[in-house]
Every structure is written in structure tokens, then in C-alpha cells.
């Protein structure tokens, strides 16, 4: 799986076991991701942070 880094078009190949790409947003600025990468389990959203996860190449 290939996931975008914080600034596309840069991306990386995920290590074994991390089969999801994710984007993390601050709830106050939902249009600007603050973190992107590979992850094994999609984290739960909180009052301050929202996660968007997906499982296809460079979908984040």
C-alpha cells in the first residue's frame, strides 16, 4: 500500500501490517490536514481531532 505524506505528491510505501492510509484534521480547520501516513487501525475521532482512513493507494 502506498500512502501520501503530509504534502502530496510525496508518498511512501507502508510497512507490513499498516494497511490503511489516513489523514488527520483538527476539527477547527477541517480543510487542512495536519498529518498523513500509514496506520494499522483507524483512530477514533475526538472533540479536537478527526481522522479519515482508507485502504487504496494514495487515497489520503
Curated annotation (Swiss-Prot):
Cross-referenced InterPro entries: Cytotoxin_Cobra (IPR003572), Snake_3FTx (IPR003571), Snake_toxin-like_sf (IPR045860), Snake_toxin_con_site (IPR018354), Toxin_cobra-type (IPR054131)
Localisation: Secreted; Target cell membrane
Domain of life: Eukaryota
One matching Pfam family: Toxin_cobra-type
Example GO molecular function: toxin activity
Keyword entries, A-Z: Cardiotoxin, Cytolysis, Disulfide bond, Membrane, Secreted, Target cell membrane, Target membrane, Toxin
Tissue-wise expression: Expressed by the venom gland.
Intrachain disulfide bonds: 3-21, 14-38, 42-53, 54-59
One annotated Gene Ontology cellular component of this protein: extracellular region
A biological process term (GO) from this entry: killing of cells of another organism
Family affiliation: Belongs to the three-finger toxin family. Short-chain subfamily. Type IA cytotoxin sub-subfamily.
Main function: Shows cytolytic activity on many different cells by forming pore in lipid membranes. In vivo, increases heart rate or kills the animal by cardiac arrest. In addition, it binds to heparin with high affinity, interacts with Kv channel-interacting protein 1 (KCNIP1) in a calcium-independent manner, and binds to integrin alpha-V/beta-3 (ITGAV/ITGB3) with moderate affinity.
Subunit structure: Monomer in solution; Homodimer and oligomer in the presence of negatively charged lipids forming a pore with a size ranging between 20 and 30 Angstroms.
Protein name stated in the entry: Cytotoxin 4
Lineage, broadest ranks: Eukaryota, Metazoa, Chordata, Craniata, Vertebrata
